[in-house]
């Protein structure tokens, strides 16, 4: 089983959010590969983040690695600015895009909440992927 623990906090007027995945019990190789790919893709997206780069480039990094590994992302999930407001601009798509949502600078905080999926990235009526 793959368990994701997502922790949010509101402290002294600011929001924080973090997430970590854990393998619990017997996990098949496909599950282990998915967790490793998610970790690698998340770290590549973080490594891309530097002042002067467009926020939209994060989606390109994620999309390239997701495609290389045969996975998908859910196009209507996104990362976002975070601080005094939990979900704030800029909203960061997790797929290649040309949305002009600004250039990174020192100071603003960003929640890169990339989701990597084995499915085709479309949500079903019951919410499953």
Name each model feature, range by range.
Residues 1-129:
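Active-site neighborhoods and metal-handling regions in enzymes and metal-associated proteins
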